[in-house]
Amino acid sequence: MLQELGRLLEQNMLTFDAANELAEDMSLDLASQRNSGEISNDAFLEAGVIQGGISVLATMVATGVDHSEMIVHFNQIRLRAAAICTNFPEMSVVLA
């Protein structure tokens, strides 16, 4: 999901709707994996930070924030996702 988000952002094609859809898809995937026992509740809660960051990015798009600021925010999301994947390797698939 983050790869798709990054691609859209780098091409300056990210829309509010696309970012919101990615955040919603991530929410559904995370809930499904938590409910099935594929990921722990701790991993689920940690990954929620990434989903929230994507929602913030959607708001940034909607309010016309400068593209360079959105790139900075996305890079922070990506760094946080990498840290989560270090602690919870099973999250690599969801956060990729």
Q: Which residues does each PLM region occupy?
A:
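Short terminal alpha-helical segments
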Residues: M1-R34
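Long, amphipathic, charge-rich alpha-helical segments that form helical bundles/coiled-coils
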Residues: S40-G64
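Generic structural signal for well-ordered, non-transmembrane alpha-helical segments
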Residues: M13, D17, E24, G48, ...
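Short, solvent-exposed segments of well-ordered alpha helices
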Residues: E10-M13, D17, G37-G48, S68
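Amphipathic, soluble alpha-helical interaction motifs
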Residues: D25, D29-S32, S36, G53, ...
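Helix-centric, low-specificity signal for extended rod-like, repetitive segments
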Residues: E4-L5, S27, F44, D66, ...
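Amphipathic alpha-helical binding modules
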Residues: A62-A96
